[in-house]
Amino acid sequence: MSEKKGATLFKTRCLQCHTVEKGGPNKVGPNLHGIFGRKSGQAAGYSYTDANIKKNVTWDEDNMSDYLTNPKKYIPGTKMAFGGLKKEKDRKDLIAYLKKATSD
């Protein structure tokens, strides 16, 4: 896994809609700080779809990988417009970056 490659993926595929820093703003998508260990649909100040709230999953590496493979399949009704990362290596790299960038 490569955090560096994950950071590049985040900048090119995620940054237009998400922030990762503590206290960062919600954009089109929610701020992701503290995402691991948090339940879906629970970022403060972000207006989620009922689908995200009702999924009621606690984010970890495994289910985040499943979600990033095909977000609309994992949570039908999500407003995340991202089509997904099909390559497992890309998902692992992105998750390695997110684990570091979204923690305290």
UniProtKB/Swiss-Prot annotation:
PTM note: Binds 1 heme c group covalently per subunit.
Localization terms from the record: Mitochondrion intermembrane space
Record protein name field: Cytochrome c
Domain of life: Eukaryota
Gene coding for it: CYC1
Pfam families: Cytochrom_C (PF00034)
GO cellular component, one term: extracellular region
Database matches in InterPro entries: Cyt_c-like_dom, Cyt_c-like_dom_sf, Cyt_c_1A/1B
Family: Belongs to the cytochrome c family.
Coiled-coil intervals, chain numbering: none
